[in-house]
C-alpha cells in the first residue's frame, strides 16, 4: 500500500509542476512525462481493483472496504480533467483513502490475505494490461511523431509494476517458495522490468524492424514480452 501511495505522491507532488496530463499550457510541451504519468496511473488503477476485489477480502461473501471502493472510483476520474473536479484533487483524495486503509491494517481492522489464488489474480490482472501495452509497442501504424507517447506510457506502467512487485515478492515469498522455481521466476520478472526502466534513449526512433534505424518501441517490447510470458508461467504454477 505504501508503495502505491508513494508512486502517486511522487507524480502529484514530487515532480516539478506536478500532474501534467491536464496542464493546458506546460502539458503541451511535456508529452513524454504526460504519458509516463498515465502509465503509472493505469498500473495503480489495475492494482486497486485487485486490492478491493480479492487481496483484502477473506472470500466472496466478505464486504468490500469502503476506502478502497472510494479510492478506485476516484482513480477512475479522467486524467486530463483540469476543473470540476481536477484530476489532481481526485487522485489526492484517492491517495488519502489508501492512507486511511493503511491505518486500518495497522490497527487490525482489515487484513491482507496472502493466498495463492490472490497472487494469481493479481498477476493475471497485470498480464492483461501488459498485453495491451505490448500490442501498442509493435503496432506498425504508429507514426514517428507519436511513437514516444507509447514508449513512455509503457515505461510508466513498467516502473509502477516493478516497484509494486518488489513488495509482492516479499509478501508472497512463502507461496512462491512452495512452487517449483516460483521465486526464481518472480526475480526474472523484476529483472526484465528493471531492464525497461534502464532504457532511456535521448530521441525515440521509430525505424523499421529490419531497418538500420532503431525502433525503440520494439526494443522496449522485448523485455515486456518476456514479462508477460513469465507471468503466464507464474499463474500456472
Where are the model-predicted features located?
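Charged/polar, low-hydrophobicity segments characteristic of intrinsically disordered regions
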Residues: 76-89, 191-209
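N-terminal Sec/ER secretory leader and immediately downstream segment
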Residues: 1-87
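C-terminal accessory extensions/subdomains outside the catalytic/core fold
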Residues: 192, 199-237
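Extended amphipathic alpha-helical interaction segments
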Residues: 88-190, 194-198
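Structured alpha-helical bundle/scaffold domains in large eukaryotic membrane-trafficking regulators
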Residues: 56-63, 138, 173-180, 201, ...
Amino acid at each position: 500500500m505504501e508503495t502505491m501511495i508513494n508512486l502517486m505522491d511522487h507524480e502529484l507532488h514530487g515532480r516539478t509542476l506536478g500532474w501534467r496530463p491536464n496542464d493546458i499550457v506546460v502539458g503541451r510541451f511535456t508529452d513524454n512525462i504526460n504519458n509516463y504519468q498515465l502509465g503509472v496511473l493505469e498500473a495503480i488503477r489495475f492494482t486497486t481493483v485487485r486490492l478491493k476485489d480479492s487481496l483484502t477480502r477473506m472470500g466472496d461473501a466478505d464486504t468490500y472496504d469502503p476506502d478502497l471502493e472510494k479510492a478506485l472510483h476516484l482513480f477512475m476520474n479522467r486524467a486530463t480533467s483540469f476543473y470540476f473536479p481536477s484530476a489532481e484533487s481526485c487522485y489526492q483524495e484517492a491517495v488519502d483513502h489508501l492512507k486511511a486503509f493503511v491505518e486500518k491494517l495497522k490497527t487490525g481492522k482489515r487484513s491482507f490475505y496472502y493466498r495463492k489464488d490472490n497472487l494469481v489474480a493479481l498477476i493475471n490482472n497485470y498480464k492483461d494490461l501488459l498485453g495491451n501495452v505490448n500490442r501498442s509497442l509493435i503496432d506498425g501504424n504508429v507514426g514517428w511523431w507519436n511513437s514516444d507517447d507509447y514508449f513512455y506510457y509503457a515505461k510508466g506502467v513498467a516502473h509502477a509494476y516493478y516497484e509494486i512487485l518488489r513488495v509482492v515478492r516479499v509478501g508472497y515469498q512463502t507461496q512462491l517458495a512452495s512452487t517449483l522455481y516460483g521465486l526464481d521466476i518472480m526475480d526474472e520478472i523484476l529483472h526484465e522490468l528493471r531492464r525497461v526502466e534502464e532504457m532511456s534513449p535521448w530521441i525515440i526512433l521509430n525505424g523499421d524492424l529490419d531497418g538500420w534505424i532503431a525502433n525503440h518501441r520494439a526494443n522496449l517490447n522485448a523485455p515486456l514480452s518476456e514479462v508477460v510470458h513469465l507471468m503466464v508461467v507464474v499463474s500456472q504454477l
